[in-house]
């Protein structure tokens, strides 16, 4: 079988964004605050600057409905891992598990959302 190296190089080059690192969630803490919840999420991501950085994380239910979103306003090149919180997350009564996933500026999400037990 003869390999077409220019075609192979083009295929590898076009897949480069897919090979970028997605954010990794290391820890999630959840705390009841009145009728709402606060989540504190610890993320690790190889931020390189404004060209590629973890730019947010979201809280979703089992069906993927967004319950909250925390925008990350700048790269954390020299602060890894880092923790950021989101207040006033409304979790529907009776919901015992929510999920958190992080996003980066390259459009990648955490490989698998992290399940978080909602204390009752």
PLM features per residue range, with description:
Residues 14-17:
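N-terminal signal peptide c-region/cleavage motif recognized by signal peptidases
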Residues 25, 36-38, 81-85, 97, ...:
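Intrinsic-disorder/low-complexity, polar/charged segments enriched in Ser/Thr/Lys/Arg/Asp/Glu/Gln
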Residues 52-77:
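The feature marks short-to-medium sequence segments in extracytoplasmic or secretory-pathway proteins
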Residues 21-57:
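Short, surface-exposed binding/anchoring microloops in extracellular/periplasmic proteins
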Residues 1-7:
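Bacterial N-terminal signal peptides that target proteins for export
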Residues 32-35, 59-66, 90-96:
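A short, structured loop/turn motif at beta-sheet edges
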Residues 69-108:
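Short, solvent-exposed, Trp/other aromatic-anchored flexible loops in extracytoplasmic proteins
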Residues 109-118:
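Edge beta-strands of extracellular beta-sandwich domains
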